[in-house]
Structure formats: C-alpha cells, structure tokens
Amino acid sequence: QSDGALIQCMVGQQPGTEIRYNWLHDTIKYGARFDGNGAGNNGLMHHNVIWNVQGGIMVKGFEHNLFNNTSFDNGDKNDIIVMIDQGGNDGTITRNNAANKISGHRSGSYQDYPVPGIYDHNWNGYETNQNIKDFLMDPENYDFRPHPESELIDAGTNIAGVTDGFIGSAPDQGAYEYGGEMWVPGISWDLVEVFGEDFSEPEPMYDGSLFH
C-alpha cells in the first residue's frame, strides 16, 4: 500500500468528525489526515500528539479546525500540513498548535508556503528556528507537557469547547496545559470494576485460516 494514515477520513466522513486526545507515532504513513479531492470540510482535530510518522497531520479541503496539537520528528514531511491545493483550506483555522514544521505544503517551508485560512497563536519551528522538544517536559519518556519555563505557557487563545478550564492568563499552545491533566490516550478503566468478576473476554473465532 502506497498511501494511508493511522487515522484517515475521506470526504464524506469529514463533516462533524472530531479527532482528539491521541498519541500517533511510529509508522511510515501519515498520523491523521482529512484526505480526498478537496471537497471535505468541517472536520476538527485537537489535543493530539504525533511523532515519528511520515507527515504528522495533513488537511485537504476547507473550513476545518486544527487546535492544540503537538507534532515533531516526522521524517522529511512537515509536522502539520494545511494544504494550499486540493480545496485550498479557505476558512480553515489553525490555532494553538506547537510543531517544528507547520506549512501549507507537504515538505516546503512556511516561508515558501504560508498556511492558508486563519493561522494564529501557533508555535512553529519554521518561524522560531528552535526545536519544540526543548520546551516540553520529557518527550523521550512521553511527558509532552510544557516545562515550567516553556514559552508555550499562556501563549494560546481561548477556544470554546476546546480549551475550557485552562490554567493561567490564557491557554497554552500544544496538546497539554501546564499544571493541567497529564492525560494518557486509550482505555484506562478496569474491566472488573465496570463488568464485575463474572466478565470474561470472548474467545477468538478461528475458521482454519483466519482469526475473527
């Protein structure tokens, strides 16, 4: 397969879709993508951390929302790609993100390919000439919170329904709030607590060639 993403939404799936609170990492494909012919619109991605993929976030279409994502170390493609072509991303809002490479092109710089739509309150390594990992607590050990001296702190802007409950004078840039919850993606509840001692996991079905 020559194309793909860990989370892939085609045109008809994008309106009203919300991709949030994920760690996406370690693949030769994209992290999360609104894909297709450019007719997709009104998708939302927020509070995702993406690293060690081949292109972090890619968005085609228009009137999407990209808020409070953190992305770095994603090969020779950019960390957040808001495509200038294939829909043009008119009306797309890119805000409160923190990434080493945010651009309107798969691999070209922000200076050569400015992000289309509305672009503000982002930390972009193309603009700062710094590494976003230097402003995170311990990214090598999966602690992506801003460290106490990080310039990400209070550098964002409030977004209703996304940054509610922020700490300080303004929301932080990126997927984590300094002093806020150290969230970890995935199921954290206990099966026994929810279903009781009688719960048993279903046995896999094997038909001689495939597990179902």
Spans of features found by a protein language model:
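Hydrophobic side chains in beta-strands
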Residues: 9, 22-24, 34, 50, ...
